[in-house]
Amino acid sequence: MFYKMIERKCREWFQSEACTVHDLIDYIEKKGQMRDAQIGAIKIYLFLKIACGCRPLAELFQAGTFNAENLDEIELSTRTRQYLAANPAARALFEYSRLENDKGEQVSTNIEGKIKQNPESLDYEDFFQTAFYHISYTDYLFSLPMGAGKTYLMAAFIYLDLYFAQNEPSNPAFAHNFIILAPSGLKSSVIPSLKTIQRFDPSWVIPEPAASDLKRRLSFEVLDQTKTASKSNRTKNPNVQKIANHQPFKKLFGLVAVTNAEKVILDRVKEKDGQIDLFEDSDDEKD
């Protein structure tokens, strides 16, 4: 249900003069290669990235970013109305509690009633922190129906990020490199599917010549190699070698690394003379 508040504010942004990507969305729609569900997700993605600064959802809700209701049109006591007007997190939870699902059922008449009667009784910041798992980093989840083209949507996100990162290299909202985590139990079927990202035509979402330029700059690494034992008691990790080949990392742009979750769990990263150490210590050496 949080999505409804985000989507509502997203529509307002796209209808306003503050939106800076009207031409880009028009281009994507006229190109006619992306499906409606994919375009809808791209709109939300760009809204969160540009209008919301790619901030964590808990922070955005606490700041009242998605608040939209007119308090003067709701039956409230003067005290409650003033409290909600002065506390955006409280107002956000109040608006959330009044949302209705597809069956017309209200999210929570109980929360709405508590806020109306005694708005000071609830810890609004804690509610949103708990709702979004107390994480401090940005974490956006996009859920599409089966067959709607999730892999190509991922590719579109990657190219859109690179497009804006190339124009605004110091803007932290846009990534320069990417890591895709495939479910380990399904890596035999999922990772080959993710390789279709390489075949995605960026001109579906980005005009030329920028699309072709970014396509040339994109590099794709599948980190699926097993460790190899050397003559010593140290183990060489060929996946580390693949990443090390892209040094210097300060200038790295356009790398897409695909792996299963376990492969990114590291005890430490060692460097020697400014280069990544490609060997891992044995269990005895770690002790």
Feature names for model-found ranges:
Residues 1-287:
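RecA-like P-loop NTPase motor core of helicase/translocase proteins
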